[in-house]
Amino acid sequence: NDYVIYRELRTRPGYLYSKDAVVRTVRELGQLQLFDAQNINPEFKNADPNAGTVDIEYKLTETGSSQVQLQGGYGGGSFIGTLALSFNNFSIRNLFNPKAYRPVPMGDGQALSLSFQISRYYRTYGFSFTEPWMGGKQPVQFSVSFSRTEQFGYSYRSYDVDKSKRVYITGISVGLAKRLRVPDDYFQIAHTLSYQHYDLKNYPNLGLFTFKDGNSNSLAYTISLSRNSSGPNPIYPMSGSSFTISAKLTPPYSLFNKVDYGKLFEERETASNNGDSERIAQIDQERFHWLEFYKL
């Protein structure tokens, strides 16, 4: 739809001519990944020095905004199949409009991806959705994603699958990102709230925990500040720069959950000295029921 283009224009009827505005418009149109960024050429027409007016026409060439990935392979005694769908110009408002399916609703500049991977001993699937202009008036980006991994015990010698041993990992995240005006509008601040749940049953080989039965949870908040002026092609930029600083942290559970972690640490040391792996697993299940960390 045309408004997906119009909202990125820095040159509007009645505006004073600005070379910077033209260059920025070319960059923003290239960042959409809906057009060939190498061939966005502004043409100047009907220049009138007396009236101080000029018409600017942007020549755009659409590129494929959707991708389909289908892969199959064999390894470790198992067939592995992958299906991934990506739509960079999706239209969720037409999701229930049968006439909009050609083959899927398109035109609103939203991004939707779906992925599936399956083999004899694991399967994983997920989706993500991004709305770059939530509400349609301000460049506030909304995103949501979901993923699920199911893995079972597997012998690489006999190629046997043991479904009595399994781990499920479920994750979901919601994010908001806003374009800033100060110091300049290349800056963006983003907030993301994410949750992951680990559910283990007789599964000793995950590598994250010492216990093989139990569950663990991770609720984390991520804040990032970025500046990206690279372009016009987002994949092969020819100018500009990009940097990001971020912090990820969880709630300080140890301050209010009334668990004596010092005592647990001492008990774990004792169990470790005695070679009591079962007690170590019990202690670690309590220690890591809710993960607590920060990362800069």
Give names to the regions the model predicted.
Residues 205, 255-257:
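Extended, well-ordered alpha-helical segments in internal regulatory regions
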Residues 250, 289-294:
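Outer/extracellular conduits and scaffolds centered on Gram-negative outer-membrane beta-barrels
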